[in-house]
Design a protein with these regions (language model features):
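Nucleotidyltransferase catalytic core that binds NTPs
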Residues: 1-169
């Protein structure tokens, strides 16, 4: 089963409120190890710090929920900025506003109440953009099994790189 959850203006949503939201949205679905969770962000990020914070919270809270259901190998992907909408083909799509539903191919649609930002969470920062700040970036490491941490690292590297991203395996 392929499930999409769209967030608009993610802001300072805390990990606890996100974990509860994932439980609320996914609790009635028959997920298994082959299921895929696609978290779709409509926000435009200008600072790598804000993107890193959002990715960390989303991967942590969604993985916490899946682990609580013994779904250790369920895939999680956070989609930001440019991605192919046609490749999604979702069984379920959860959106904060019905108007987002027409953008994606889905079998089932559900509108949910997105929690408000939590003022006690670390606030997103302002400052000069570091999007595509470096022409070339290089990463080394072992990427033989891509896990959530690797996805965050690769996303951040792609965010700050404008021309060439070199990844050693």
């Amino acid at each position: 089963m392929k499930v999409g959850i769209l967030f608009h203006e993610l802001g300072n949503l805390g990990t606890d409120s996100l974990t509860n939201l994932f439980a609320q949205l996914l609790g009635d679905l028959k997920l298994d190890a082959k299921s895929q969770l696609k978290i779709i962000l409509t926000d435009t990020f200008r600072l790598s710090y804000n993107l890193d914070t959002a990715l960390g919270r989303l991967y942590s809270s969604s993985r916490d929920y899946l682990l609580s259901k013994d779904l250790y190998s369920t895939s999680i992907d956070v989609l930001i900025q440019q991605f192919s909408v046609n490749d999604l083909q979702l069984d379920w799509l959860f959106v904060p506003e019905e108007t987002y539903g027409c953008r994606f191919t889905h079998k089932n649609l559900r509108v949910f109440q997105q929690p408000k930002s939590n003022p006690c969470c670390e606030p997103l920062t302002d400052g000069p953009s570091d999007f595509e700040k470096y022409k070339v970036s290089a990463l080394g490491g072992t990427f033989d099994h891509i896990h959530d941490g690797h996805k965050i690292l690769l996303s951040m590297a792609a965010f700050i790189t404008s021309s060439r991203l070199i990844v050693g395996v």
